[in-house]
Amino acid sequence: MYFARTLSKNDLHKEAAEVFEKAVNMDTARVELLKEMGSEYEAVKDYDKAIGAYKRYIDQAKDVKLNDYFNLGKVYYTAGASIRPTEDGVVMTESDSMRMVDYLKGADSLFAHVVEKAPESYLGYLFRGRANWAIDNPQAPKLAKPFYEQAIAVMEKDPQKNAAGLIEAYRFMGVHYIGLEDYPASLEYWKKILELNPDNAEAKRMAEVLPQYIQQ
């Protein structure tokens, strides 16, 4: 597989993926190559082929790790999140919307498996929040909220280590409460962001603006 890996190092990812695929098809016992094949297809944003490769690995390998499920979930999530209108103001087609939802539901299912097997980790909760928020649905914030709350509960045990994830989750909560016009609740989350990163421009702006709405 030296040739395939050399192609990959030279950013010829599609060509590398095809070499890996031929090798696996010629010798189906070489299951470990499926992950490399999936990674190469992922690099060229051929998400369907990447998903297919990772799923084959999970189905066939004897030493599947929880991280393999997590990584497959991330590919599903990236595939779903990549489906957007091509121009501002253009409504997404029904078929694209259905494809996006299917990918994101696939991601959510895999992240739910991660939560089940590793409830002490914040990653499953955080990515379930991301997947549900990305769904093009008015109920998306409501669907995502419990997962972000669970992620926060885990991450707040070590705020400095988990600062990036906490800022993301606090931002979601802040935006969510603005949508509900619960400005005091929203303000608390922007303040939490500033405790972790006093230079966060968005949080500074919201901390200045929201008190005006609270006083009205």
What spans do the regions from the language model cover?
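Alpha-solenoid helical repeat scaffolds
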Residues: 1-180, 202-215
